[in-house]
Amino acid sequence: MKINFAAIKFRPSLSSEPVVIEDIHKQIADVIWQRKEVAAGKFALKLYDNPEVEVDETEKGYIREAVGEFRQWVAAPILELFED
């Protein structure tokens, strides 16, 4: 299944709803909707690391914020488990 990452915009904050533009597969939209923090972070990381995907400055801002959310709400609590 191909995903058009450029057609996805991430939530600008934890309190806002995800914004999906253009046509993407419904199941991807469902994942983002149901598992907002984790899915947004994972998709953002994939997109952020993929030099083939072209995004505009607004989308880059959404990506940076989603990566930050992923780190704050998912990665940080996991890392805390390994701290002395």
Label each region the model flagged.
Residues 1-84:
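Positively charged, low-complexity terminal tracts
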